[in-house]
Amino acid sequence: PSQQGYDRAITVFSPDGRLYQVEYAIETVKRGSVAIGIKSKDGIIIMAEEKQRKLQISENPQKLFQIDHHVGAAAAGYIPDARSQVDDAVFFSQSNKLVYDESVSIETVAKHLADQCQQFTQYAGARPMGVAMIIGGVDKNGNLLFLTDPSGTYISYDAVAIGANSDKATEFLDKEYKDDISLEDAGVLGAAAIYLASDVKDGTDHIKMCQIKSDTKQFELISDEQIAKFAHAAKEK
């Protein structure tokens, strides 16, 4: 096939201007379970689907991460790459605090992770990051939500979905999202979007959520009981 010589080397563009290895990495994201971020008038809510095996013991979410006291993240794709990016982001955030004596901005974290992804698109001997990250939080600029992908792109959103069947969730969010949505209604909206994208239509064991409220600027995991309330309200809509 004509593309064969171009999809083996990450540093070589095809004649039609494509980097096949980067495109394959983006396909990896599409195979991951769905993750969603929503900006509300009083905070940010981030959630992810985490399917668990019957005998699996999991005390902490595997696809939700705390980067700083005011910054959270969710991942879709190759999760070990996400852990590597989060570790780097945590170190970057702490270094920023030491150097500038202020909390890092949400966009600065998103740009840093996007820059890291971009580096892995231009050097031979390394593969692209196989993960997309939703970065959200509250800083002096307000409530902010960003998406990074394996190409090194980062974009700000009001609401975003990534992972398997994210097109269904995105279409739903496009239709139902409102600028003045409350944090609680955002939780209900996100739960409804996850049910649309997931093949699991009952229960909430597969849904994990976190939030950063505007008034506290503190990352916190949402309890299973509260997630169940969101899910119940979502099914009544």
Give a label for each model feature.
Residues 1-237:
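Long, low-complexity N-terminal extensions
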